[in-house]
Amino acid sequence: MKGSLIIVVFFVLGIIVSLCDVIPSSFPASDVSYYALCCLMFCVGISIGCDTSILKSFRKVNPRLMMLPVMTILGTLAGCAAASLILGHRQLSDCLAIGSGFGYYSLSSIFITQYRGAELGTIALLANIFREILTLLCAPLLAKYFGKLAPISVGGATTMDTTLPIITRYSGESFIIVSIFHGFCVDFSVPFLVTFFCSL
């Protein structure tokens, strides 16, 4: 929750700074976004490569539960496709690109801003932050009424880090490895799916 609020604060500060004309109009904002994206992808690669224990722990995951990330991805994309029918002013590819962030707001919003512009990037940022906050706030209800796997699926890419403690609390410690595996797989899919739908 704290991390999400910090991101929102910096986002709002960026808007205020731009509106106050503090930054010159010649400032290469798109180039900065691109280099920030490259740095972020580099850091993601380092974090995965350094933590070999994550890869080793995946051997303990029940083979049937390995399908959970696939179901999360398909369910999210189906929901986004349905939303595009209601939001007539948005293309199907826009909605699918936003949904493909799966809660990974920092990466997906930069990608979408780079490919589709600041407006859609902002929507992606807020939509994915709301997904994380929804998981944090509703995990008890999700686990109670929809089963122990529900908070994991709703958490999307966040289940290996920010939402892991709350999932562990309400789904149980037996789901820790499943949650990490789920988050890793969904997290890994984000750059590929977002760029794919943005290119349509």
Label each region the model flagged.
Residues 1-76, 92-103:
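Helical membrane-embedded segments and adjacent short helical loop/helix-boundary regions
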Residues 38, 135-136, 163, 191:
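Hydrophobic transmembrane alpha-helices of multi-pass small-molecule transporters
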Residues 93-133, 148-181:
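Alpha-helical membrane segments and immediately flanking helix-loop junctions
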Residues 66-112, 130-146:
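Transmembrane alpha-helices that form the ion-translocation and gating core
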Residues 21-22, 87-89, 116, 147, ...:
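Short helix-capping/hinge motifs at transmembrane helix termini and TM-loop junctions
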Residues 46-57, 83-84, 110, 139-143, ...:
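C-terminal ends of transmembrane helices
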Residues 189-200:
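Juxtamembrane boundary at the C-terminal end of a transmembrane helix
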Residues 52-81, 121-133, 178-186:
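Entry/N-cap segments of selected transmembrane alpha helices
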